[in-house]
C-alpha cells in the first residue's frame, strides 16, 4: 500500500510534469497569429501546497482542502526578463483573487509565486475582484485596474444576484506589494477600464466601458475615453465613445478594451473583445483596431469581423463560446504574446508580431454593415485574385 509520503511525492511529480510540459506551436493557421497546442495555465497548475494539507495528522486521506476551479482573464507584463501573468484565479467557492505566474519564455513553464496577491479593500469592501489590466505607466508605477463587484443593496429583498461593478485601482513597484487606491468615480457602472501607458496633455488617460447595469451595456455606446488628473483620487468627469457598437456585428451587445494598446510607428494597436447574442447565449470574440499616435481617440484602422474566436476545446467551459483577453506582451524584437482565456476556464497564448498585426489592421476590409456590402467586398478580392491566377 502506498504511504502518505509516497502519495505526496506522486502529487508533486504529476504537477511538475504538467508545469514543465513543452508547448508546441500549431503551424496550420491564417498567417496572422500562431496558436499553441496546450493551455499555458489551468487550475491544475496551481501549487500542490495551495490545494492540499500536506500534514498526515490533519489530512490522513490526502484530500484537496481548497479547490481551484479556473485560471482565466490575466493581465500580463515583461518583468526582469520573465513573462508574468497576473491571473484571475477562481476557487471552488466562486471567489476570484489574483496570483502571479511567471515563465522564462512566455509559452510554457509558468510557475506560480508561492503566495497569491494580497489586495487591501476600498472604503466599501468588494465581494469579488477580477480581470486585472496591467499598465507600466510613464510615471514609474505599474497600475492594475480591475473589476470590483459588490451586491446591489438597492435590489429587492431576496434578490441575491443583482450586483454593481466599479473599477478598482491599485499600483505597485514590484508586483508583490500593492497599494490600493480609491475606486474610479464614474457616473455609471464600469468594467474593462484600462490605463493608457503615457500621459495625454499632462493627464492620465483611461479607456472605459460605461454600462447601465452589472451585465448589460444598455445605453453605453462602446469603448470610451476619459482623462483624469490624479490616479490616487481618479474621477471621470467627461467621457466620450471612441469605438462604437453596431447592429449585427461581432460587438453589437457590448465591447471592451483588452490590454493597454501597443505603441507602433504606424499608430496604437488595440486588442478588444466584442459580444454578440446568439441562440446559445452570448458569444465573446476578440477584435482589433488602431488609433493615431498623436490622438489615441482617433480611429485609423478598423478591420471587420473577429481577430480570434473560440476553436476546438476553447469552446467548452464554465461559460462556453467565449474568448477574453486583458493581457499581451510586445518584446523588443517585435514578437507579441497574446494571452487569452477560453470559456472562463483556462489560459492560452498565441504569438504574432507587431508588423503582422499592423498589416492585419491596415489591410483587412472594414465591416460594411450589410450582406450586400460584404458580397461586394468579397467580389473585389476575387476579381483581383483571378487576374493573378491567370498569370500562373
Where would I find each of the regions flagged by the language model?
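Well-ordered alpha/beta subsegment
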Residues: 312, 329-337
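Active-site/ligand-binding surface loops and adjacent short beta/alpha elements
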Residues: 260
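Extended, compositionally biased non-globular segments
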Residues: 323-327
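Beta-rich carbohydrate-recognition and catalytic domains
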Residues: 1-73, 77-127, 136-194, 198-253, ...
